[in-house]
Swiss-Prot record:
Highest taxon, organism lineage: Bacteria
Sorted UniProt keywords: Ribonucleoprotein, Ribosomal protein, RNA-binding, rRNA-binding
GO annotation, cellular component aspect: cytoplasm; small ribosomal subunit
rRNA-binding found in the keyword field: yes
One Gene Ontology term of the molecular function aspect: rRNA binding
Originating gene: rpsS
Pfam families associated with the record: Ribosomal_S19
Keyword Nucleotide-binding found: no
Protein name, UniProt field: Small ribosomal subunit protein uS19
Family statement drawn from the similarity comment of this UniProt entry: Belongs to the universal ribosomal protein uS19 family.
Gene3D superfamilies reported in the protein's UniProt record: 30s Ribosomal Protein S19, Chain A
GO BP terms in the entry: ribosomal small subunit assembly; translation
């Protein structure tokens, strides 16, 4: 369910400050964050943000198409390894 338009997009303040300083200094190092719930803003385009997936930080290079989406959408938390093979099919 999308967020109400009257509330506006959400971004954690600590992440916003890190993004602003990275843009000011023109720093290309990945910004580590645990904030998967933050919305991607236009200021983030061109930056690499390392989003935590519960186990490690996944580097996400932000493009213009990603604006408006959440950071967590681009760092998968579950790995699907397929269903167990059927014993009858192996014979």
């Amino acid at each position: 369910m999308p967020r109400s338009l009257k509330k506006g997009p959400f971004i954690d303040l600590h992440l916003l400050k890190k993004v602003e300083t990275a843009v000011e200094v023109k720093d290309k190092k990945p910004i580590k964050t645990w904030s998967r719930r933050s919305t991607i803003f236009p200021e983030m385009v061109g930056l690499t943000i390392a989003v935590h997936n519960g186990r490690q930080h996944v580097p996400v290079y932000v493009t213009e198409d990603m604006v408006g989406h959440k950071l967590g959408e681009f760092a998968a938390t579950r790995t699907y390894r397929g269903h167990a093979a059927d014993k009858k099919a192996k014979r």
